[in-house]
């Protein structure tokens, strides 16, 4: 269930790029921009990127986007911990959920049976301390950041016209190298995050997501500004390392509890 929420939110984030690319506001963004969205969301992102690029020796706007991504993701670590704990609780509950599913069988044709099944499943999740929305908060928070970053890049002349490596940050990668890297890191990141899922039904669903999500990233990356694709890549790499570290910490905590 958690994976379904994540898949929907990731899909919405990617769809956001497609929609934004067709309705981008060309008005330059600066400290005098008005409106809640421009002044409190887009401009702060633009300011952060410009500040890093201008004040850190050797930094470019590409490096500034990478640093800004790392800062944002680091600030979201507490939410990631909550997300991982939620995933661990869901894994522990799988045997009980499977028993419940076997008890009721196919409930699609019996409304009363379906209601009872949903009620018992909700009670089981509540007793296990699992909240399906806990794992979605990092994605929910990233969506406005994602949108603000798009506008910060496209509406800040200095960022939009700057280059990093072989790409112009305000335009799509002409060689499609960054979108391919973004798709590959998305695939690997999903494999790492989902490697402790055990149920057969989940495995089939996750295999489908592991194909669909990177494919969507690749498709959107062909049209997205290179600065935004750079944000995806950096975020994926950070999430991979974060998941590996958190998994080790959680496993150590579980071993200590078993020994106590």
From Swiss-Prot:
Lipidation, S-diacylglycerol cysteine type: 23
GO cellular component: plasma membrane
Subcellular location: Cell membrane
Topology with respect to the bilayer: Multi-pass membrane protein
Cross-referenced PROSITE patterns: PROKAR_LIPOPROTEIN
Signal sequence residues: 1-22
Alphabetically ordered keywords of this record: Cell membrane, Chaperone, Lipoprotein, Membrane, Palmitate, Protein transport, Signal, Transmembrane, Transmembrane helix, Transport
Molecular function via GO: membrane insertase activity
GO terms classed as biological process: protein insertion into membrane; protein transport
UniProt-listed Pfam families: 60KD_IMP
Transmembrane portions of the chain: 29-49, 52-72, 133-153, 164-184, 213-233
Main location: membrane
Lipidation feature positions (N-palmitoyl cysteine): 23
Coiled coil feature spans: none
Family: Belongs to the OXA1/ALB3/YidC family. Type 2 subfamily.
Role this protein plays: Required for the insertion and/or proper folding and/or complex formation of integral membrane proteins into the membrane. Involved in integration of membrane proteins that insert both dependently and independently of the Sec translocase complex, as well as at least some lipoproteins.
NCBIfam families per record: yidC_oxa1_cterm
Protein name, per record: Membrane protein insertase YidC 1
Originating organism: Bacillus anthracis
Name of the gene this protein is made from: yidC1
């Amino acid at each position: 269930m958690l994976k379904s929420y994540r898949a929907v939110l990731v899909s919405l984030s990617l769809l956001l790029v497609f929609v934004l690319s067709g309705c981008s506001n060309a008005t330059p963004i600066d400290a005098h921009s008005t409106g809640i969205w421009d002044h409190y969301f887009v401009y702060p992102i633009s300011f952060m990127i410009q500040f890093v690029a201008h004040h850190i020796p050797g930094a470019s706007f590409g490096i500034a986007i990478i640093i800004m991504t790392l800062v944002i993701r680091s600030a979201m670590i507490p939410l990631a911990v909550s997300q991982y704990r939620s995933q661990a609780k869901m894994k522990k509950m799988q045997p009980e959920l499977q028993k419940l599913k076997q008890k009721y069988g196919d409930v699609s044709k019996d409304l009363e049976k379906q209601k009872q099944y949903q009620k018992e499943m909700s009670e089981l999740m509540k007793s296990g301390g699992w909240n399906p929305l806990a794992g979605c908060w990092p994605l929910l928070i990233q969506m406005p950041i994602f949108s603000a970053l798009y506008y910060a890049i496209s509406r800040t002349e200095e960022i939009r016209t700057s280059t990093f490596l072989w790409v112009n940050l305000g335009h799509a990668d002409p060689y499609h190298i960054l979108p391919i890297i973004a798709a590959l890191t998305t695939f690997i990141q999903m494999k790492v995050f989902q490697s402790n899922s055990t149920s057969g039904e989940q495995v089939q669903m996750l295999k489908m997501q592991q194909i669909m999500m990177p494919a969507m990233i690749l498709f959107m990356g062909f049209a997205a500004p290179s600065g935004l694709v750079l944000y995806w890549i950096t975020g994926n790499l950070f999430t991979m390392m974060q998941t590996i570290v958190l998994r080790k910490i959680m496993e150590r905590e579980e071993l200590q509890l078993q020994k106590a």
